[in-house]
Amino acid sequence: MLVLPVSVAIGPAHAASRTTRGLQALYDFRSSTGSIVVGQSRSGAAPGLKISDTKAVTRSEGSLAVRGKTLIRTQKPATTIIESIRRSGEITIEAWIQPAKIDQSGPARIITLSKNSSERNFTLGQNGDRFEVRFRTTKTSGNGIPSLSSGPKSLTTELTHVVYTRSRSGQARLYLNGEAAAEQTIKGDTSNWNRSHRLALANELSKDRPWQGTYHLVAIYNRDLSAAEVERNFHAGAGAETTLAQNRPTPGEHRFETEVAPLLAKHCLECHDSSTVKGGLDLSRRDTALAGSKHGKVILPGNAAESPLWESVDANDMPDDRPPLSAQEKKILQQWIDEGATWSLETIDPAIYTHDRQAGTNWVRRLTLEEYIATVESTVDVDIDQEAREILPPDLRADGFSNTAYNLIVDLKHVEAYARLAEIIVSRMDVIDFAAEYSQSRKLTDKSMRGLISKMGNWVLRGPVEDREVDSYRGISTTVASAGGNFKDAVGFILEAMLQSPRFLYRMENQRGDGGRWPVDEYELASRMSYIVWGAPPDRELLKAAEEGRLFDSAGVETQVERMLEDPRAIERSTQFLHDWLDLDRMDHLRPSPERFPNWDPNLASDMREETIAFFKEVVWEQKRPLSELLNAQVTYATPRLAAHYGLQLGGDGLARYDLSTVPSRGGLLTQGSVLTVGGDDASTVTRGLFVFHDLLRGVVKDPPPGIDTTPVPTRPGLSQRAIATERIANRSCGACHSKFEPLSFGLARFDGLGAYHAVDEHGNDLRDDGEILFPGAAKPVSYGSSGELMDLLAGSERVSKTLTWKVTQFALGRPLVSADARIVDSIHAKARAAGGTYASLISAIVTSDLVQTTRTETH
């Protein structure tokens, strides 16, 4: 096959950008001097390549021409690249090259990850007028034979874009200048890849397969790029500026974002942000911070000693009424100013740093109670709901959700409960019928049982069972047989053991690596996807997709997510998020004062919860509206009892749908009893304001200093809740913090502690529902004239929309988000918003993001 190098670009291209997902090493030969070829990857630096004989090469910006015999190799084994591809089982090798001549053979090594002429993990080489790729698997030779070659006369001395991809299922393809040139199935997996091999260009490690020509770009991915991605990289051109280079922060920017901004957020923004501006100084925004206070500039770049900010911090005058900065924190601040005070963020958002103390910890995820119940039912078709809720300890909330991994501990009560439940589950199963799905044999022989255990375990434990695990479960059947038991007994006891296995009760993942982010394997990804979308284990279709390697293709993942979102379990999972986010369990414990609310009907608490769930399903699933419209959608669901409580004209029986387009005071989550009751009997402006501040605006406020009297002030004739709040805001000791959140509740003032609407309170005080809202990060507040206008402002706010993205993402991951996640969450939000901002689009964006596709590895 003859492939002509048509429209090949050397210089930077503007029509397309290169794909970077899964990129493990990129060499673009930007440097024109030296003996080291510098590399980069998505996680930082890739291993450098040392040129053994610099006289044999000519370097210029964007290219490296090999004119004589040399070897360009890593000085150590390419461990990160090797381990990453061992895990993924996939690869893409990409090069922009110009061969110097046609008669190079051996094959002559263009790119190789190998030891010598007969031992390799892979090699891209030249054999005369063809390209040849050798890729080692458990089904090939140690030399990567059989190989894949392009057709005769496909290699020329023109600039050529050559790409080799190999999927986990074994499908290997060779592309030349964006077009498919050859394909072949290379069976086996990469578990036998040698960890000691080095990456090299222009020769074999044994220096006996030299190649001459010019390199413009070399890239290695741990996944197989799709044909569209290969074409995209081709059209980007040989000299395309990579997204990695464009987006990587400078050392100064990195220091500001990882050290200085968190320091300012922690110690300074309580008094010096857009809402307080104490002393006329706002340190939350770049323009205002560098402009200074009403007394002048406080930061003099390059001169900490004369910067008022540093002087006040160094003297422990600031922060006021709070502990001073530590010696290390002071050093960071001083050094930052002296080095030029680089300020790379337009706005410092304290919310993204709130949980950074947990940033370096990987928590193994135990199944929550809801997930355990769903997993049992999906795996063995047994409904264990009632018994599980009675026997298992409840999951406790932490950081706003009950599925927070670090709080999902296992104690002796859990161990005993899981053992009891496993026995109950197996007693309800038709064990023989269940085993028949995996083996028709009823023998207790080693061959029969090992095959059954392997196949059954793959389903029950959500992935392949290792030999040592098979040995362990096989020991159970051996013990049963020696005691006179039969096949049914053996399978029953094996199932009980599997149902108590950490692999069943936890979402176990391989986290060993180099400390960077590595891709999860196909079965780990399948479990992540299913528990995010369904709160349940992968079904057979998803496991099949994992087994066939279809989940390492973004289109394959999106296809599965789209299918999964059509399943009723996706709706159930979304309502679990809603239930957890709004803490709807509160309604089970709602006990209003009978003196204040003599007409309270305890059944209203359940009605309020059902209202919110039905409303959520209507907006999110029936109308498929953007999540932010949960704040102002003019519809609700109510029983006759709840409708009367709200003062609505009665509709149908049971839980009926109500159109609120003519009821301006109601519409959206904040006007529903399940949320309004967060303020307690007194309809507290503090707790309601904090709810809006924390859960809708992602605002941050510290606890009050020691010694501050926090006793609630009661209302009375002439003193409403708003008047009390206004006095607090004006108080020097309280106002700096309370001004951030209490005004957020003013628009809810006409709703009493149980959500009923009134124009006056119980003392006859007029209730106003107008006010102002200052969105975090904004320079100026926005006024509203009624609760309805407030709801519209919230629904239209980018801050609220992004907060919902953060909340759903946190629930999906089962952990608080940290500053290292912020850029990825921003991209998730942008992708979801471009697709309509719906729940479905958000879930799809989360699942296809690096937060789900990769894991943070540990070095021990």
Q: Where is each model-derived feature located?
A:
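Short surface loop/edge beta-strand patches of beta-sandwich-type extracellular domains
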Residues: A16-R18, R67-T92, L113-S114, G144-S154, ...
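Aromatic- and Gly/Pro-enriched helix-to-coil junctions and flexible linker segments
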Residues: H14-T19, L217, D224, A228-E437, ...
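Localized edge beta-strand/strand-to-loop motifs within extracellular or lumenal beta-rich domains
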Residues: E158-R173
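Extracellular glycan-interaction patches encoded by glycine-rich segments
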Residues: K187, R195-H216, I220-D224
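Glycan-recognition/cleft segments
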Residues: I51, R109-R136
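Short, aromatic/His-centered strand-loop micro-motif at the edge of beta-sheets
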Residues: R134-H161
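Sequence context surrounding c-type heme c attachment/ligation sites in exported
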Residues: N247-L290, N303-P308, S312-K331, A643, ...
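Extracytoplasmic low-complexity segments
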Residues: M1, A13-L71, S114-N116, E231-N247
